[in-house]
Design a protein with these regions (language model features):
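Residue-level signal for inorganic ion chemistry
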Residues: 19, 81, 118, 194, ...
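Residue-level detector of alpha-helix initiation sites
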Residues: 10, 122-126, 260, 309
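Short beta-strand "acidic-cap" motif of Rossmann-like dinucleotide-binding folds
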Residues: 26-30, 143-144, 171, 245
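Phosphate-binding loop of NTP-binding sites
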Residues: 72-76, 85-224, 231-238, 267, ...
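ATP-dependent carboxylate-amine ligase
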Residues: 1-35, 40-50, 136, 271-276, ...
Length: 426
């Protein structure tokens, strides 16, 4: 079988890797001729390169990659296509899908499985893992994955895995930018909404538009929303069944009121699925923070809070609960200047020190300009390496609390693992 992957962003590259891993041949293309291909699981030595100033072609036995152009004939020869989720609904994708089937239509075993989606701005990954632990403790075989940006292997990987295995439940993390795509690809029975916040506004433009996307997504499904969620009346009207959830009241290792709500959502879904209360309680009592998500470590006198918080609402939810001496903030990509609004929140809470480090890309200069324009009068420091971050953490470790977060999941995981190691040795 051969598939065409159109668009080599995060989801596209994860689709390529999943297809190759499942024995498919792949034609992959992106109009950007400078796409970073380092995370494709293909040995470079096995490839032939054809390169000019505008286009690049890479050929091996199992994959052909065209950058800077698209070979329509190569797409026509494929059994299925995998478009980038962000392209779904656009004119180009619609034209492609008139002539070629999407992978989720060629492989459709996943559509017969009981399927739960978790979406929202913040807390999706943690909630998915909480629910997975509960369901597996109840004896269910769960296939979990979805949103490549959340650390999973992408939506197409779920389609491929479901085709080959036997599972009781499909559990999907759904990015808020891919609601229409996921609504087409999967047949959701239940959907949980963690929250609605200020993220991906370059796509949604307004919260009202985001709400409208959710209304479309919720139509005809059993939907779980927080008891005080904005737009609950709209969501209830769209849903086949609407269930409110509340903050979790039992033992939980994770910090923050936001995680009590995440646990409340996971437990509400479990109750609807008739999972025994003691199974839910024991599963959540043992639950550890997901790698890269908010966790707390002790170094000398300081509590070190470390975790990805890449939008203003995520950061505010942490800073509103604790006074921090220093905030370490990872910077966004060059084309994501809107994400710098996390610095507005940082300045509002007025820590003694703000430390900037390269997160997704080295946009420290942009972040420095933003801080200065906001009139922040505290101490601003910049660092470029993990060792420099650790040196400053040690310097501040006799204060009460330090926060490390912002953008850059991989960078934050590296920091988290080093901090954890130091904490365990003390």
């Amino acid at each position: 079988m051969r598939a065409a992957v159109i668009g080599l962003g995060v989801e596209g590259k994860k689709a390529v890797n999943s297809l190759l891993r499942h024995g498919w041949e792949v034609y992959a293309t992106d109009l950007n001729n400078r796409v970073d291909l380092s995370d494709l699981d293909v040995p470079i030595m096995s490839m032939d390169f054809v390169n000019d100033e505008q286009t690049v072609s890479i050929v091996s036995d199992e994959i052909t990659v065209d950058l800077g152009f698209t070979n329509s004939y190569a797409i026509e020869q494929c059994d299925a296509i995998a478009i980038a989720p962000s392209m779904y609904g656009g004119a180009f994708a619609t034209r492609l899908l008139r002539d070629s089937p999407l992978l989720s239509d060629v492989l459709d075993k996943h559509k017969s499985m009981f399927t739960i989606g978790i979406t929202g701005t913040n807390g999706k990954t943690t909630t998915v893992h909480m629910l997975k632990n509960i369901l597996e403790s109840a004896g269910k075989k769960v296939l979990v994955g979805g949103n490549g940006g959340g650390g999973f292997s992408g939506y197409y990987d779920l389609v491929l895995e479901a085709e080959e295995g036997e599972y009781d439940i499909l559990l999907v993390e759904v990015c808020d930018m891919t609601l229409d795509f996921c609504n087409y690809c999967f047949d959701f029975d239940m959907v949980g909404l963690t929250n609605i916040g200020n993220d991906h506004m370059d796509v949604h433009k307004t919260i009202a538009n985001y709400k409208d996307s959710l209304v479309r997504f919720f139509k005809g499904k059993t939907v779980f929303t927080a008891f005080n969620q904005d737009f609950n009346a709209d969501f209830k009207e769209a849903a086949a069944k609407s269930i409110s959830y509340f903050s979790y009241q039992d033992e939980l290792k994770l910090v923050g009121a936001f995680n009590l709500l995440n646990a409340g959502l996971a437990s509400a879904i479990a109750r609807e699925l008739k999972v025994p209360k003691d199974v839910v309680r024991d599963s959540l009592a043992d639950f550890e923070a997901v790698r890269g998500r908010m966790d707390v470590y002790k170094i000398n006198n300081a509590s070190i809070y470390v975790g990805k918080t890449d939008n203003s609402d995520a950061l505010a939810s942490i800073l509103s609960e604790k006074d921090f001496y220093a905030l370490f903030i990872g910077t966004p990509r060059y084309n994501e200047e809107h994400r710098l609004d996390i610095l507005d929140v940082a300045v509002k809470y007025n820590p003694e020190v703000i430390v900037l480090f390269p997160g997704l890309e080295d946009t420290v200069d942009m972040a420095m300009y933003r801080l200065n324009s906001l009139g922040y009068e505290g101490n601003i420091k910049t660092v470029n390496s993990l060792d420099e971050i650790i040196e400053l953490v040690a310097e501040y470790s006799h204060e009460d609390a330090i926060f490390i977060g912002g953008n850059g999941q991989d960078a934050i995981i590296d920091i988290q693992e080093r901090i954890k190691l130091i904490s365990e040795k003390l």
